[in-house]
C-alpha cells in the first residue's frame, strides 16, 4: 500500500503566524475600500458566531477575500483591476 511521504523538514513559516499576517494585510486593504462601520459589524458578527477562535480568524479572512474580490471585479475606483464601463459615442456607436 502506498503511503504519503514523510515531512521533509520544518515548515517555511508557522501556520498561525502566516494566518495572522494575511489577516493584517486584508484588514489594511479592506479599510481602504469599505466603511469602518461595515467592517466593525463584520467583526462583531464573526465574534458572536465563532468567538475568539481560529475558526473565526479563518472566517474573517474568507469573507474579506470574497468582499475584496467582488469589489475589485465590479470596478473599484482605486484600482486598475475590474470591469470599467466603456464610453460610447452617440447612439451607442463605438469609435473603431
Curated annotation (Swiss-Prot):
Compartment(s): Virion; Host nucleus; Host extracellular space
Note: HIV-1 lineages are divided in three main groups, M (for Major), O (for Outlier), and N (for New, or Non-M, Non-O). The vast majority of strains found worldwide belong to the group M. Group O seems to be endemic to and largely confined to Cameroon and neighboring countries in West Central Africa, where these viruses represent a small minority of HIV-1 strains. The group N is represented by a limited number of isolates from Cameroonian persons. The group M is further subdivided in 9 clades or subtypes (A to D, F to H, J and K).
Protein family per UniProt: Belongs to the HIV-1 VPR protein family.
Any Pfam family: VPR
GO biological process: DNA-templated transcription; monoatomic ion transmembrane transport; protein homooligomerization; regulation of DNA-templated transcription; symbiont entry into host cell; symbiont-mediated activation of host apoptosis; symbiont-mediated arrest of host cell cycle during G2/M transition; viral penetration into host nucleus
Assembly, per entry: Homooligomer, may form homodimer. Interacts with p6-gag region of the Pr55 Gag precursor protein through a (Leu-X-X)4 motif near the C-terminus of the P6gag protein. Interacts with host UNG. May interact with host RAD23A/HHR23A. Interacts with host VPRBP/DCAF1, leading to hijack the CUL4A-RBX1-DDB1-DCAF1/VPRBP complex, mediating ubiquitination of host proteins such as TERT and ZGPAT and arrest of the cell cycle in G2 phase.
UniProt GO cellular component terms: host cell; host cell nucleus; host extracellular space; virion component
Gene3D superfamilies for the chain: 6.10.210.10, VpR/VpX protein, C-terminal domain
Superkingdom of source: Viruses
Modification after translation, per record: Phosphorylated on several residues by host. These phosphorylations regulate VPR activity for the nuclear import of the HIV-1 pre-integration complex.
Keywords per UniProt: Activator, AIDS, Apoptosis, Cell cycle, Host G2/M cell cycle arrest by virus, Host nucleus, Host-virus interaction, Ion channel, Ion transport, Modulation of host cell cycle by virus, Phosphoprotein, Transcription, Transcription regulation, Transport, Viral penetration into host nucleus, Virion, Virus entry into host cell
Chief location of this protein within or outside the cell: virion
UniProt-recorded name of the protein: Protein Vpr
Organism: Human immunodeficiency virus type 1 group M subtype J (isolate SE9173) (HIV-1)
Coiled-coil intervals, chain numbering: none
Protein purpose: During virus replication, may deplete host UNG protein, and incude G2-M cell cycle arrest. Acts by targeting specific host proteins for degradation by the 26S proteasome, through association with the cellular CUL4A-DDB1 E3 ligase complex by direct interaction with host VPRPB/DCAF-1. Cell cycle arrest reportedly occurs within hours of infection and is not blocked by antiviral agents, suggesting that it is initiated by the VPR carried into the virion. Additionally, VPR induces apoptosis in a cell cycle dependent manner suggesting that these two effects are mechanistically linked.
